[in-house]
């Protein structure tokens, strides 16, 4: 289908959103036990039909390989039986988490006796636009259902068969438990026009969350008429302070850069204090070369590393645009900085506000870094790969928000609710 939005597609997507809203009204009244039973049944169904989902995914993988998709994106696209099983286990974990709906955030009595309470309630219809991430379909469905929300999904062409197979498993479970299948729907049948319609559907969709590369995220932020929660691309930094334990730093960097290169919490830039650069850079360059990581370096780093005669090294001069680039590949930018202030200034200038890490033993340096870095997550002597809803104990995540309004960092169940105020009176009137 053409990317251009026709009135017919817009009307169809709005009808789907309205169906989702009506179904969500029923879900919002469901108790925690009913929602947990639903989630456990969905997890069992995913396990039962994992081979069918894998078969659909194999077709998506084959087409994407033929279309030249890079290795990082192919890794995200893969949804084989083990990954389906992991997703199902994530759904079970969501069922064990506290239900945020109905939680009293605060409450107090006014001098006139009026009792005020601020209570957590579902957002309503959450729209999700993402690309080549079939696990997100399961994650979003489970989080939305537990938090009392409906989900309207645009999962992208690359994963269209996989997502359809996954939703085909979830829909009958919803109906078997007395809920409408409209609670979790896809607009993939409309191609990119479906995403455009979602961005236009203000008044039908309550909030829109993009999850993908920087281009996708910025396109949604710029063009959406629906309120957006921005999940950020990850131009993620690790800073090696002069007080850092260099032996500790090497495995942290290798893990952060190479464990999964196509994810937003993978490290992209390495900043090294000048006092330890001569000692540390040849060591880390050798370790990165062994992992087939291409190095984009500033002049000082280049001079130090090039003199070390490291076998298999792919060493290059960094261009200015490198410092703002999320590679999502076996590539890393390296820069020597004069001091902690210079590292913080560089990060706050070039970061996307996702995750940064400091390797240091000096408490004052750690405190300065954690206070001044303007990102959603700051790690100390740990890999940036820990920025993840599952790792944080959320079971799954809607995304990792890099904005400051509503939610910041990994978005779990609580971040998928809003609040309402309820006033309990005994006849009070305002003078």
Curated annotation (Swiss-Prot):
Q: Is Transferase among this UniProt entry's keywords?
A: no
An example Gene Ontology biological process: L-proline biosynthetic process
Q: What is its main location?
A: cytoplasm
Enzyme class (EC, first level)? oxidoreductase
Question: Where found?
Answer: Cytoplasm
The alphabetical list of record keywords is:
Amino-acid biosynthesis, Cytoplasm, NADP, Oxidoreductase, Proline biosynthesis
Question: What pathway is it annotated to?
Answer: Amino-acid biosynthesis; L-proline biosynthesis; L-glutamate 5-semialdehyde from L-glutamate: step 2/2
Could you tell me the EC number(s) of this protein?
Answer: 1.2.1.41
Q: Which Pfam families match?
A: Aldedh
GO MF term (any one): NADP binding
What Gene3D superfamilies does its record include?
A: Aldehyde Dehydrogenase, Chain A, domain 1 (3.40.605.10), Aldehyde Dehydrogenase, Chain A, domain 2 (3.40.309.10)
Can you cite an annotated GO cellular component?
cytoplasm
Q: Which reaction does it catalyse?
A: L-glutamate 5-semialdehyde + phosphate + NADP(+) = L-glutamyl 5-phosphate + NADPH + H(+)
| Entry's family note | Belongs to the gamma-glutamyl phosphate reductase family.
Q: What does this protein do?
A: Catalyzes the NADPH-dependent reduction of L-glutamate 5-phosphate into L-glutamate 5-semialdehyde and phosphate. The product spontaneously undergoes cyclization to form 1-pyrroline-5-carboxylate.
UniProt name for this protein: Gamma-glutamyl phosphate reductase
* Taxonomic source organism: Bifidobacterium longum (strain NCC 2705)
Q: What is the lineage of its organism?
A: Bacteria, Bacillati, Actinomycetota, Actinomycetes, Bifidobacteriales
């Amino acid at each position: 289908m053409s990317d251009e939005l026709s009135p017919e597609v817009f009307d169809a997507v709005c009808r789907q959103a309205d169906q989702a809203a009506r179904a969500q009204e029923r879900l919002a009244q469901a108790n925690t036990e009913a929602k947990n039973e639903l989630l456990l049944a969905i997890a069992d169904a995913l396990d039962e039909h994992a081979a069918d989902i894998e078969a659909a995914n194999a077709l998506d993988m084959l087409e994407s390989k033929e279309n030249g998709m890079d290795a990082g994106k192919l890794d995200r696209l893969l949804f084989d039986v083990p990954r389906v099983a992991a997703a199902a286990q994530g759904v079970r974990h969501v069922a064990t988490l506290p239900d945020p709906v109905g939680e009293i955030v605060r409450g107090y009595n006014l001098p006139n006796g009026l009792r005020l309470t601020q209570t957590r309630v579902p957002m309503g219809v959450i729209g999700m636009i993402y690309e080549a991430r079939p696990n997100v379909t399961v994650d979003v469905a489970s989080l939305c259902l537990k938090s009392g929300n409906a989900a309207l999904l645009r999962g992208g062409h690359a994963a269209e068969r996989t997502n359809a197979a996954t939703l085909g498993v979830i829909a009958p479970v919803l109906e078997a438990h007395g809920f409408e299948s409209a609670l979790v729907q896809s607009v993939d049948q409309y191609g990119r026009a479906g995403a455009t319609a979602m961005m236009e559907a203000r008044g039908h969709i309550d909030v829109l969350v993009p999850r993908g590369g920087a281009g996708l995220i910025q396109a949604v932020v710029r063009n959406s008429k629906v309120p957006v929660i921005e999940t950020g691309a990850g131009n993620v930094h690790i800073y090696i302070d002069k007080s850092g334990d260099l032996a500790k730093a090497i495995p942290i960097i290798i893990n952060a850069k190479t464990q999964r290169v196509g994810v937003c919490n993978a490290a992209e830039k390495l900043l090294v204090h000048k006092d330890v650069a001569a000692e540390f850079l040849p060591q880390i360059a050798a370790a990165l070369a062994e992992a087939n990581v291409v190095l984009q370096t500033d002049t000082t780093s280049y001079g130090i590393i090039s003199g070390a005669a490291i076998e298999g090294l792919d060493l290059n001069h960094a261009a200015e645009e490198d410092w703002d680039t999320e590679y999502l590949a076996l590539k890393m930018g390296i820069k020597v900085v004069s001091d902690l202030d210079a590292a913080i200034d560089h990060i706050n200038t070039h970061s996307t506000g996702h995750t940064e890490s400091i390797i240091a033993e000096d408490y004052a340096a750690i405190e300065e870094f954690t206070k001044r870095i303007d990102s959603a997550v700051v790690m100390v002597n740990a890999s940036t790969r820990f920025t993840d809803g599952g790792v944080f104990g959320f079971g799954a995540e809607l995304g990792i928000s890099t904005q400051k309004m509503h939610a910041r960092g990994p978005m779990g169940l609580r971040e998928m609710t809003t609040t309402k105020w309820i006033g309990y009176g005994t006849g009070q009137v305002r003078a």
